[in-house]
Design a protein with these regions (language model features):
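Extracytoplasmic
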Residues: 35-37, 51-55, 91-93, 116-118, ...
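N-terminal Sec signal peptide cleavage junction
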Residues: 19-21
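A short, solvent-exposed beta-strand micro-motif common in secreted/extracellular proteins
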Residues: 117-128
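Early exported N-terminus immediately downstream of N-terminal targeting peptides
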Residues: 39-76
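Glycine-rich, aromatic-bearing surface loops/beta-hairpins
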Residues: 23, 129-164
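Tryptophan-paired
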Residues: 73-114
Length: 164
């Protein structure tokens, strides 16, 4: 087989194997990264969780399989199984637990997660009412403000230069 034929065969084989294999061969597979967040603010409204304290976990997920399991997990199940997951898979998660009372604000700086690498970040809030109460935070944003309201929460991207 000529060089040209061998090259054509190799190219066709690579294309048939799929993009994931090619990305792996050239070192372009996705990898865990450090959050780019300059800050993360947790803010409980006056009536947060129907005027009750609320548990909030910021979770850096360091294992792709664990991410698949947690992505659809409601907060109630997370809080019920968190300790077991941390015991069973200690290297797969870094959990930053907080508890806020209504009208409380906690501001976190990038020193908190400095040097940590993760596939994704999730926030779980332990509301008294039923619901998912989970959000995924993109690691490549400047930061977030998590606003805990009466029956649910929102996570808004922090715009560079904007006040927290």
């Amino acid at each position: 087989m000529s060089r040209r034929g061998l090259f054509a065969f190799a190219l066709a084989a690579a294309l048939l194997c799929g993009c994931g294999t090619m990305r792996s061969l050239v070192g372009m597979d996705p990898k865990p990264v450090s959050p780019d967040w300059k800050g993360l603010t947790l803010r409980a409204a006056d009536d947060a969780n129907s005027n009750s304290a609320i548990a909030v976990d910021v979770v850096l997920v360091k294992d792709a399989t664990m991410l698949d399991a947690l992505t659809n997990m409601p907060a109630a199940k997370w809080f019920a199984t968190r300790a077991e997951l941390q015991r069973t898979f200690p290297e797969a998660l870094t959990v930053y637990p907080y508890e806020l009372v209504p009208n409380q604000t906690i501001k976190l700086t990038d020193k908190k997660w400095n040097g940590q690498k993760a596939w994704a970040a999730l926030v779980f809030a332990g509301y008294a009412n039923a619901g998912e109460h989970r959000a995924r935070l993109l690691l490549n944003n400047a930061g977030y403000v998590v606003l805990l309201n009466a029956q649910g929460f929102s996570a808004s991207e922090l715009k560079p230069g904007a006040p927290q």
